[in-house]
Regions:
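Metallo-beta-lactamase
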Residues: 19, 23, 29-30, 122-206, ...
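Sec-dependent N-terminal signal peptides
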Residues: 4-12
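Active-site-proximal loop/helix segments of hydrolase catalytic cores
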Residues: 201-257
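Active-site metal-binding loops of divalent metal-dependent hydrolases
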Residues: 41, 64-66, 94, 116, ...
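Conserved beta-strand hairpin/beta-sheet module of binuclear metal-dependent hydrolase folds
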Residues: 29-77, 216-230
């Protein structure tokens, strides 16, 4: 669950050697023939990265972004790489930045996900719970207020102009949230579903619980590509719905797939399965340190400040010092309680 600022920073990173087609809101990196990795240009709030998989007749889109406006912008920019219609949408999991554009596709394409995604969207009041609650309802107004203060204190016209652009995007993003109607998938599966896009096989796999209770891995066996959503990112994922021990096991199953490129829901494509092993280590270490602090009756809010996972900063440069997202540590404590029952 990432903010506009993170999207803007990622947009500024050097491009890979793959060809890139840039639209207004999204840029499409060609991974192989007919497979494009879509990331934000920074011109609007978009949410997760997306993938476009082009078949003989139509297109499969992985995840739908953080709002209907983001989904419409994606479809408009998609015209730069294909004129084929979107026939399938896959939600890798239920979090807002991967599903809040679903309503744009409803009735026009099959929206497919693990059966838990339908349950979550229909039953969990997703616009009033985490991660939407903090990432959108709290952080966006706070960001808008902070930008207004920074504009008032800006010392030069160039800085003020840049801040005003950020403010405009943040305010537009806030307004775009008002349009959201949580829309569940109309097609679900439990373990595996295979789609044939005409000469291109796409497997939808539930390898086990992890980031959430219903994570889908999109696997292209011929192209040796996986799209892992937030089950495996190239950075540290949000953990507020995690099943920690199972996550490690599920990642082990992911490593057994014959793939060469991972297209994650956030971050950048990667090829080294060693990054998955590093994240498994991060999870084990977080679980151990969290359990030790819990035994000392340290509250989750304090534990989130104390855990030290800097041993993994080489693999995950976002780690700048001790500490972890408090929502993840709260979930870790909750998860430990669940295991006692």
């Amino acid at each position: 669950m990432k903010t506009y600022l993170l999207a803007l920073l990622l947009a500024m990173l050097p491009q890979s050697s793959n060809s890139v087609i840039t639209g207004k809101a999204y840029k499409f990196e060609k991974i192989t023939d007919g497979v494009f990795y879509a990331t934000a240009t920074g011109s609007m709030v978009t949410g997760s990265n997306n993938v476009a998989i082009i078949g003989q007749r139509d297109v499969l889109v992985v995840d739908t972004g953080t709002s209907p406006a983001a989904a419409r912008a994606f479809l408009e920019d998609l015209k730069a790489i294909t004129t084929k219609p979107v026939g399938y949408v896959v939600n890798t999991h239920f979090h807002y930045d991967h599903t809040d554009g679903n309503q744009v596709y409803a009735g026009k394409a099959d929206i497919i996900a693990h059966e838990y995604v339908r349950f979550a969207i229909e039953n969990l009041n997703v616009l009033q719970r985490e991660p939407y609650k903090t990432s959108q309802l709290t952080n966006v107004p706070t960001r808008i207020d902070n930008l207004k203060k920074q504009i008032g204190n800006a010392k030069d016209a160039q800085t003020k102009s840049a801040l005003e652009q950020q403010l405009r995007i943040a305010q537009e993003g806030w307004e775009q949230l008002k349009e959201i109607t949580p829309t569940p998938p109309n097609v679900t599966y439990s373990k595996k579903k295979v789609l044939n896009l005409g000469g291109r096989e796409v497997q939808l796999l539930f390898l086990g619980r992890g980031h959430t209770n219903g994570d889908t891995v999109v696997f292209l066996p011929k192209e040796k590509i996986v799209c892992t959503g937030d089950l495996m990112e190239s950075q540290i994922a949000y953990m507020g719905d995690a099943q920690f021990a199972e996550w490690i096991t599920t990642l082990e199953a992911l490593k057994t797939l014959d793939f060469q490129t991972d297209l994650p829901g956030h971050g950048a494509p990667f090829k080294d399965k060693g990054l998955i092993t590093a994240f498994q280590g991060y999870l084990r270490d977080l679980m151990k340190q969290g359990a030790d602090l819990r035994r000392q009756s340290i509250p989750a809010e304090t534990a989130a400040q104390r855990v030290d996972l800097t041993a993994y900063k080489t693999s995950f440069p976002q780690i700048q010092g001790p500490g972890a997202d408090v929502r993840g540590v709260r979930r870790l404590y909750e998860w430990m309680d669940e295991r006692k029952k």
